[in-house]
Every structure is written in structure tokens, then in C-alpha cells.
Amino acid sequence: MIICSDVDGVILNYIQGFIDFTRKEKIPYSHNPELYGVIRNFPDNLEVRDQFHSGEYLSQLKFYDGSMEILNMLASKHELHLVTALEPEQSKKRAENLKMVNYTTLHCVGDDRKEETVVEEIQPDVMIEDRPELIEAFHRAGIRVIFPDWHPYTKGMERFATPFSLWNEVPDLLHNSLTTD
């Protein structure tokens, strides 16, 4: 099976990393968990994004509970590709943050190329994604999608994908997809 996973918001807690960054740098910020994209909705978002990405914050994001262990178990049995909307110049920091994960490939492709990279290049059997518009796009492309339901902004995505609440549920979801397809 070819498995592809997003990174931020799925494997790594980018949201909490950004909140910690704003607190440490004394940047006023109020997070709205109903909206996707902690930086996207920020005033002067490109400047703040560049500041966040230029430091060590990006290479020190915390893993969601169980994500590393489950991904390594999956990687021992399947192809595991990681794709992130981070720009290619952030590849080194992202690889540093993910050094404990045994993935097949890591793609830092930028926001504009993520959908194309997944659908046309990787062509996974299953995609793990949290961005609502990409969940829908991958579903329309015929890719089975599962998503973490711990983000309020993924509410309603059950129409297009299968939710999971804990990473230890993922192997069973993938096994069930093999037996039902």
C-alpha cells in the first residue's frame, strides 16, 4: 500500500508551535481553532511566517501522541510518503524535525504544488490530511482520505473522508480499507 501523509497538523503540532513562538517573541495573537491555518489568518502573515520559519521553531515542533510510533510501524510494511506545504527551502528543518520517522520520501513543495504532487506524482492509496479543501480535493481525485478529527476546522469532513481521534486507530482504518476496496 502507498500511504501519504501531510505533516503539519497531522504528525507535528504546528499550531502549538506557532502559539509558543508568538508568546516567546511577544507577538500579540489570539488563535481561532475554527479556522484552518494559524498563519494564513494573521495580519502581516508573510512577515510573521518568515520570522517563525527562520528560527529553530520549525525544526522543534512536537509530535502528536502516537504519530511517530504508528508511522514507523506503517513504514515497516508500506511505502510512506510525507508531503508538506512548507516551501522547499524549509526541507532541511523539516527533515531534522522528522529524523525519527522512517519515511520513504519527504516532499516540501509549497502551498501551490501540494495537491498536484500527491495526486499526480505520489498517487497514494490513502492520504492522511487535515486541510478541509485538500481532504475534498483528494477525495474527488479518487484517493481514500483519513483525517484527524481533533481540529474543529475539520468538522463536516466525514462526507469526504474517515476521521480518527487517536493515532493508534490508524492501522485498523488502513487494514479495513484494504479489505473493503
Show which residues each predicted segment covers.
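Short hydrophobic segments within beta-strands
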Residues: D6, V83-A85, I128, P148
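Substrate-recognition element of Asp-dependent hydrolases with the DxDx(T/V) motif
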Residues: L58-K62, S67-A95, V109
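Acidic, Mg2+-coordinating phosphoryl-transfer loop and its flanking beta/alpha structural elements
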Residues: V126-F164
